[in-house]
């Protein structure tokens, strides 16, 4: 691995290093770049005729960063339009830059300057928050999977921010600078360049019918796709057992779990798209089963964390279908979801890593003039919280470590009072009040709840006291049956609650992240209401219209 190049790329792609890229070229040539239509047509996934766009020569490209590199201009740089479907745009096109496409003399200077000859600039037209791509790759990094480095770039052509004055263009000149899957990427993520690399676009899969359409990347040691052909035939003949011999299925299980958490509907498992696959061995001319170890590479994360979509273990991809349909492998995926729920999406990571990461991006984006940054940040943060909650609903409810139970509307958490009690009546013993409050900055066990199977439902216990939640028949002044915690006594199933996922109904593998908590005893659900305790704190009571809740 070229350590000097990797260090330069680390500096180049540092999240707080904003690049300025000034492209100079004849206006007619620029118009040809931005307005070019893809060979084969828009959204044609059956194209086998090579590159969809034409490389053109920029007179010069000047590159600098707020921290790295120093302002440097290079002549005769290759520039090509990118994206032939969802992100296609003539007003603000995605771009590939190759600093040595037309000049070998640029190879050494650009390698020393930034570590690579290639840049990929995404227009983010499908993610106007400009947050999701960089957040998604950060999450894959935290998961220990292949990931792209990335940051932001302000890009001008002949002194004008790209897209300025063009109808319908959001945030002219602002681009997401994502590390492409090229030699330095493969070196960093796999430690060598001796394998073969392929790209899967929409509908491409490890099946014979799609073999002709799967593209082989130029860094591959061989370009005849012999290893890919062998793998496809081997899976066709031997199913899951065959797949386990030519794919790193443990790595795939991790990819599968992360696509679940990111709602990556445009990735491999849900749409057979936006995926590279690398044969992580020294490639040979006539491969057999011992010469193949394919690993997946995630790509195209701009449509992750969309609020209208669900967290789902889908089976559009053959590997996903084989894995989900097998009881043992399915259990492995669920176990991986549990593991990532605690590590990548856990409270500590969210507070110490993801919150400052998002805050930093938000500050930069506001400085660029990107609209509605606070609103966009709020929406993405909510998706991160719901991802953790979906991890509980799919991977198993909170155990002895406990978790917050929070209301979707207020984001307040279920709290077991230490000081206020519900008086005993002739029908009911007393108990500690259950209220809702804002989550404190520091973890307090009175806000954490532990679940365990009990009778027809779940016991819901306060981590602080160990006492279970009870559905009482005692009513408040406003007529609502109350909840309380008290010593264990499951008479009349008062301690049993059902946790029911909210939407999609009847889908064992899809989750919104929300749920309702309903008493088996009364059939009423937990509602974060306004009924006051004696000291004016808002109660969580029982109601026929329960609150929509989530775990965090």
Task: Outline where the language-model segments fall.
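Extracellular structured ligand-interaction cores
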Residues: 18-20, 56-58, 74-76, 92-94, ...
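Conserved NTP-binding catalytic cores of kinases and kinase-like/nucleotidyltransferase enzymes
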Residues: 1-130, 135-138
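Extracellular/periplasmic catalytic domains that process cell-envelope and extracellular macromolecules
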Residues: 13-17, 52-54, 68-73, 87-91, ...
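Metal-dependent nuclease catalytic cores in nucleic-acid-processing enzymes
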Residues: 131-145, 322-323, 335, 340
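Internal "kinase-insert"/substrate-recognition segments embedded within catalytic cores
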Residues: 96-104, 113-125, 142-148, 157-262, ...
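Residue-level detector of buried hydrophobic side-chain packing
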Residues: 23, 97, 140, 178, ...
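Middle-to-C-terminal accessory/interaction subdomains
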Residues: 10-11, 18-19, 29-33, 222-270, ...
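Lectin-like carbohydrate-binding module/patch detector with strong preference for beta-trefoil
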Residues: 394-552
């Amino acid at each position: 691995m070229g350590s000097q190049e990797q260090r330069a790329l680390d500096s180049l792609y540092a999240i707080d290093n904003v690049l300025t890229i000034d492209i100079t070229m004849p206006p007619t040539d620029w118009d040809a770049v931005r307005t070019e239509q893809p060979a084969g047509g828009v959204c044609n996934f059956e194209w086998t005729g090579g590159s969809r766009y034409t490389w053109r020569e920029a007179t010069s490209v000047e590159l600098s960063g707020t921290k790295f590199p120093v302002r440097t201009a290079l002549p005769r740089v290759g520039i090509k339009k990118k994206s032939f479907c969802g992100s296609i745009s003539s007003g603000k096109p995605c771009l590939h830059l190759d600093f040595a496409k037309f000049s070998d003399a640029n190879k050494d200077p650009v390698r020393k300057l930034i570590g690579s000859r290639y840049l990929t600039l995404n227009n983010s037209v499908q993610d106007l928050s400009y947050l999701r791509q960089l957040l998604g790759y950060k999450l894959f990094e935290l998961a220990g999977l292949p990931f792209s480095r990335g940051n932001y770039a302000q890009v001008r052509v002949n002194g004008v921010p790209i897209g300025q004055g063009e109808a319908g263009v959001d945030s002219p000149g602002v681009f997401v600078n994502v590390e492409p899957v090229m030699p330095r990427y493969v070196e960093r993520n796999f430690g060598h360049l001796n394998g073969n690399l392929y790209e899967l676009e929409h509908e491409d899969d490890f099946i014979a019918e799609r073999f002709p359409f799967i593209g082989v990347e130029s860094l591959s040691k061989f370009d005849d796709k012999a290893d890919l052909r062998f793998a496809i035939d081997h899976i066709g003949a031997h199913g899951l057992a065959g797949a386990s011999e030519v794919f790193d299925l443990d790595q795939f299980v991790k990819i599968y779990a992360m696509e679940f958490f990111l709602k990556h509907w445009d990735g491999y498992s849900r749409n057979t798209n936006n995926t590279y696959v690398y044969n992580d061995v020294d490639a040979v001319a006539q491969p057999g089963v011992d010469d193949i170890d394919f690993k997946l590479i995630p790509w195209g994360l701009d449509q992750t964390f969309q609020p209208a979509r669900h967290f789902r273990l889908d089976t559009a991809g053959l590997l996903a279908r084989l894995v989900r349909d097998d009881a043992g492998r399915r259990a492995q995926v669920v176990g991986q979801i549990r593991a990532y729920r605690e590590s990548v999406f856990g409270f500590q990571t969210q507070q110490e890593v993801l919150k400052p990461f998002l805050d930093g991006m938000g500050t930069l984006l506001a400085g660029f003039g990107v609209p509605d940054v606070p609103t966009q940040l709020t929406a993405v943060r909510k998706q991160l919280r719901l991802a953790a909650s979906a991890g509980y609903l799919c991977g198993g409810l909170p155990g002895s470590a406990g978790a917050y139970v929070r209301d979707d509307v207020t984001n307040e958490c279920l709290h077991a009072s230490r000081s206020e009690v519900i008086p005993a009546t002739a029908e009911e013993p007393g108990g500690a009040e259950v209220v809702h409050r804002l989550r404190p900055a520091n973890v307090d066990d009175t806000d954490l709840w532990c679940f365990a199977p009990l009778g027809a439902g779940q016991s819901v216990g306060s981590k602080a006291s160990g006492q279970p939640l009870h559905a009482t028949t005692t009513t408040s002044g406003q007529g609502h049956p109350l909840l309380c915690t008290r010593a264990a006594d499951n008479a009349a199933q008062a301690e049993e609650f059902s946790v029911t996922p909210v939407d999609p109904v009847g889908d064992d593998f899809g989750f919104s992240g929300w749920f309702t908590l309903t008493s088996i005893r009364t059939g009423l659900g937990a509602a974060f209401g306004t009924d006051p305790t004696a000291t004016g704190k808002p109660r969580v009571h029982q109601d026929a219209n329960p609150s929509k809740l989530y775990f965090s």
